[in-house]
């Protein structure tokens, strides 16, 4: 979701780069899989900086990712920029484990900790919005500083190309903190169809994620994050995007208006 945008920005700036992907199909792409460490050498050869995105089909990020990052460090990679989450402190599960390792071992590093992606409305919530006109979460009335993936990517490019290493983490948000009730109202106003938010229990939320193919640990972690949002953990706005990229972050209503057809085309089947 952010990697392609980072690559496009680097290409536009004339900065040499390569994209590590499970299914390389274009120039500049090389085979890479966190579960296949032998592939890493080709992806990392000659690299001075890396943008790190964790696998989304598993939750044991420290065990899987750190050995490859150790190899990257040993092979001359100087700067590490990790995409993590506003919910994960260094040493926490998943990307938090990788955050702690990078901060302890890399000479040049940055960890981006965005709040919830606006693009989640186009992916994990799209089917329920189109078919049932509903968003399901366990966030209650809690608010998030929803952020556009393009703003995260712009911050990642700044971290990769800055003359000086940041050597810290940054909490990234959009310009306003909103509840999912307010998100549903924004969708209703833009799309011209009624969309509502249905509040689930944490366990029911985890069950929905498992039904969509997530492993149990990942599903439970995401559902627990929703409960923390309900308790107010994400009710904040930071100004890191504007300060680090010198551009204002995208507002949710503008994001919805700019992508309206994604929710108004023929409903998804299956």
Language-model features: where?
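A hydrophobic C-terminal alpha-helical subdomain
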Residues: 203-270
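Conserved Rossmann-like nucleotide-binding pocket used by diverse enzymes
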Residues: 30
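Oxidoreductase cofactor-interface core, primarily capturing Rossmann-like NAD(P)-dependent enzymes
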Residues: 1-23, 27, 35-37, 45-47, ...
């Amino acid at each position: 979701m952010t990697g392609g945008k980072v690559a496009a920005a680097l290409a536009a700036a004339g900065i040499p780069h390569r994209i590590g992907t499970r299914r390389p199909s274009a120039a500049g792409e090389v085979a890479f899989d966190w579960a296949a460490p032998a592939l890493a050498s080709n992806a990392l050869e000659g690299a001075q900086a890396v943008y790190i995105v964790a696998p989304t089909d598993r939750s044991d990020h420290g065990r899987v990712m750190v050995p490859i990052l150790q190899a990257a460090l040993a092979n001359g990679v100087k700067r590490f920029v990790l995409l993590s989450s506003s919910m994960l402190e260094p040493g926490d599960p998943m990307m938090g484990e990788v955050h702690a390792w990078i901060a302890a071992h890399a000479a040049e590093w940055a960890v981006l900790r965005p709040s919830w992606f606006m693009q989640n409305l186009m992916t994990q919530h799209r089917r329920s919005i189109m078919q049932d006109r509903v968003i399901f979460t366990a966030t209650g009335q809690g608010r998030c500083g929803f952020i556009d993936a393009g703003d995260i990517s712009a911050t990642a490019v700044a971290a990769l190309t800055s003359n000086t290493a940041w050597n810290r983490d940054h909490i990234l948000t959009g310009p306003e903190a909103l509840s999912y009730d307010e998100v549903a109202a924004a969708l209703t106003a833009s799309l011209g169809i009624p969309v509502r938010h249905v509040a689930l229990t944490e366990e029911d939320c985890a069950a929905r994620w498992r039904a969509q193919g997530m492993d149990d640990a990942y599903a439970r972690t995401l559902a627990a994050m929703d409960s923390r949002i309900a308790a107010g953990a994400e009710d904040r706005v930071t100004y890191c995007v504007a300060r680090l990229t010198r551009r204002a972050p995208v507002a949710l209503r503008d994001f919805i208006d700019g992508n309206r057809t994604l929710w108004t085309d023929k409903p998804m089947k299956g």
